[in-house]
Amino acid sequence: PGGILVLQNGSTGLFYGYVVKISQSEKDQVQITAYDQTWYLKKNKETYVFTGKRADQIVKQIAEDFKLKTGTLANTGYAIPSMIEDGQTLFDIALKAIDLTLINTGKMFVLWDDFGSLAITDVETAKLDLFVGDGSLATGYTYDQDIDSDTYNKIKLVKDNKTTGKRDV
């Protein structure tokens, strides 16, 4: 734990995160749990008062305050007149700013971790040319969601190992 996990498709970065848990079964299957920077947004709480700031400016300030890396933060266009958040998670603060932008402009943005950098992208332009299954090296995945820890994206890629007859994670 504590190491860096990187997933790439050729030279395109897909996931950059930090290993927080490693498990091994009696069948020598290894499971690695890693989180990107959005995990830090959910784990930290703060109090903020914003006046006349856009959602992208709010995310930039949060990232600077908590020394998180940022990438492309699309100009969300809408200056939020006033937003007061007391003891809220950084993730909830950022999402409220994005929600207020949607409510007031009809434009939808997504906050995500773009290979180790927080990013805000207009959903109209967000698309990933990637597939999982036949013709790719990744033939399966697991997506978990639960009410207790639904705070991050968790992806588990597995590949059939023809040499060992097992699946490699």
Task: Give residue spans per PLM region.
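Surface-exposed aromatic
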Residues: T76-I84
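Extracytoplasmic/secreted envelope proteins and their assembly/folding machinery
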Residues: D56-K60, F91-L95, K154-I155
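Acidic, small/polar-enriched beta strand-loop surface segments
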Residues: L95, G106-V169
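Solvent-exposed loop/turn segments at secondary-structure junctions
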Residues: S25, Y78, A126-K127
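Short, well-structured beta-strand/strand-turn elements
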Residues: K67-N75, T101-G116
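Long, contiguous amphipathic alpha-helices that act as assembly "spine/axial" helices in icosahedral shell
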Residues: L90-N104
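Surface-exposed cap/loop segments at beta↔alpha junctions
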Residues: G2-T70, A74
